[in-house]
Design a protein with these regions (language model features):
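Domain-level signal for soluble alpha/beta catalytic cores
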Residues: 38-367
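Charged/polar low-complexity intrinsically disordered segments
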Residues: 4-5, 36
Length: 367
């Protein structure tokens, strides 16, 4: 449980002290919360960690690269150093499952598009390096290789963040094409990091993408499902323990067709999970439209938002929660830097105790 005496200076940059304030030193639960156990150390995780660095190292290194002042290798080295620092900071502060692949040079939706080979032809035609093609999609490109605009940007749900909108053309071949999550997992594993691989889920990716030709979302479902099955197969090969698939689109108002699509996708994807435990992670609200469908599927863990999800507690208490699944309870507000309320967290856990088995303490969204 986040320790009630852990405080921070709100004016400071995001650092070890700030992490201590948001999801800090964890302690033993009071006996009355889980009386059947003499003591119970809750496992903890976060959905994602800020990537820019406490001194904005990523921002400055990226700007130097764009100006031609450092090489691609130097930029990549800065990224690796930041990731290593952030992983070790989380370990130091008692996080049990540490997100990997939450880092991005620009945007996680853009990363997912590249991973799934959704790179429009106008960017391929530039014949740039993979890194520069990525940045051309993010920022546009004007130079000797051509002149193209960047992807459009849209508001990321109810936050001030804006994501890059993937473009899927009629000729796009959705398939597992990138290596980023697997390379980062290997780096984390080498450092002894208890990793949880994080990726935008197939349902949210397809719902937020823009289809630029005659084909529609339904034309790409089969290939997208195959790509995610291949992703899980690769994680099995690497020996990964957990895969987090983020599906924030589930908190929106869903139609019957949306729910059917989500169910169709995951009935197939989850067959491929093998020995990898799959966490369905939601955030920015509750899943009132699809709670029964979510809990009926073969997920090993389900992440629910108890901070912004107005009906989340009622959904769990009214409908129950599968005892064979782990609840990743989003009780720590990921949107601010204030210390977590120890008493409020205990109250939520006491309410969940009669209906839930294993619980992992989680943030409500990425930090």
């Amino acid at each position: 449980i986040p320790h009630k005496d852990c405080a921070t200076d709100a004016s400071s940059n995001f650092s070890s002290d700030a992490l201590c304030a948001v999801l800090p030193q964890f302690t033993w639960l009071p006996k009355h919360v889980f009386p059947q156990k003499r003591s119970y150390l809750m496992k903890t995780t976060i959905i994602g960690f800020p990537r820019v660095g406490s001194l904005r190292e990523l921002k400055f290194a990226s700007e130097k690269y764009f100006r031609g002042e450092i090489s691609a290798e130097e930029l990549q080295n800065t990224a690796k150093e930041l990731q290593s620092t952030h992983w070790q900071l989380q370990q130091k502060n008692g996080i049990s499952l540490i997100p990997v692949n939450d880092f991005s040079f620009y945007d996680n939706m853009l990363d997912t598009a590249v991973l799934l080979n959704a790179v429009p032809e106008r960017y391929r035609a530039l014949s740039l390096s993979p890194l520069d093609t990525y940045f051309a999609m993010a920022r546009g490109y004007q130079g000797e290789h051509g002149d193209v605009k960047a992807f459009a940007m849209k508001k990321w749900f109810n936050t001030n963040y804006h994501y890059m909108v993937p473009e899927i053309e009629d000729t796009t071949e959705i398939r597992l094409a990138g290596e980023k999550p697997f390379a980062e997992y290997a780096e984390a594993k080498a450092l002894g990091v208890p990793a949880k691989l994080v990726l935008i889920g197939p349902f949210t990716f397809l719902k937020l993408a823009r289809f630029t030709g005659e084909k529609t979302l339904s034309d790409f479902v089969e290939d997208t499902v195959k790509a995610y099955c291949d992703y899980l197969a690769k994680l099995n090969e690497l020996g990964a323990a957990w895969a987090e698939l983020d599906e924030p689109y589930l908190v929106k108002d869903l139609s019957a067709e949306d729910i059917a699509l989500f169910t169709q996708i995951y009935k197939t994807v989850l067959v491929a999970k093998g020995n990898v435990k799959v966490l369905l992670q939601t955030y920015f609200g509750d899943v009132r439209d699809c709670y029964s469908e979510i809990t009926a599927l073969d997920f090993d863990g389900i992440g629910l938002d108890f901070t912004e999800g107005k009906q989340t507690m009622a959904l769990v208490q009214k409908n129950g929660f599968p005892k064979e699944k782990i609840l990743f309870a989003g009780v720590v507000n990921g949107k601010n830097i204030w210390r977590n309320s120890y008493e409020k967290t205990l109250k939520i856990l006491e309410q969940l105790r009669p209906v839930c088995g294993d619980i992992v303490l989680n943030t409500s969204c990425s930090l």
